[in-house]
Amino acid sequence: MLTHKILGLDVGSKTVGVAISDLMGWTAQGLDTLRINEELEDYGIEQLVTIIKENNVGSVVIGLPKNMNNSIGFRGEASLRYKELLKESLPDIEIIMWDERLSTMAAERSLLEADVSRQKRKKVIDKMAAVFILQGYLDSIQ
């Protein structure tokens, strides 16, 4: 059993998908999709701080999109910057970067298999990707 819950994040340029673990550390559930705007430097950090405090979160797992050759591209650099911004606001929270290659594709595939409409998929895809990221991490620590 964990002493704190773990948050999973899928960081994009317009949204951040948010997932949270149970206290056993076995399962990840979709929690929210935050709207952000990188161009205006609005990263939704205040919203995340509130979520973290309200949900007894001790660690945050941020998806790190890597290229297939293991290099880090533009989106990966943006995720690393997001980590630094979050660390400034929450210096006591453990932040883990997790290889998220293909997590959005896996989330999209599972939504397609569940016959979810395109409009509904657009609303939940980032949250689902965060679930895939967090579940991958949780499975690795079991």
Curated annotation (Swiss-Prot):
Alphabetically, the GO molecular function entries are: nuclease activity
Q: What are the UniProt keywords, alphabetically?
A: Cytoplasm, Hydrolase, Nuclease, Ribosome biogenesis
Q: What class of enzyme is it?
A: hydrolase
Cellular compartment(s): Cytoplasm
For biological process, the GO terms are:
rRNA 5'-end processing
- EC annotation? 3.1.-.-
Q: Which InterPro entries match?
A: RNaseH-like_sf, YqgF, YqgF/RNaseH-like_dom, YqgF/RNaseH-like_dom_sf
Coarse class of the protein's main subcellular location: cytoplasm
One of the Pfam families matching this protein, by short name? RuvX
> Any one cellular component term from GO for this entry?
cytosol
What CDD domains does UniProt report for this protein, alphabetically? Answer: YqgF (cd16964)
- Tell me the protein family, please: Belongs to the YqgF nuclease family.
Q: What is the role of this chain? A: Could be a nuclease involved in processing of the 5'-end of pre-16S rRNA.
The identity of this protein, by name, is: Putative pre-16S rRNA nuclease
Look up and give the organism this protein is from: Staphylococcus haemolyticus (strain JCSC1435)
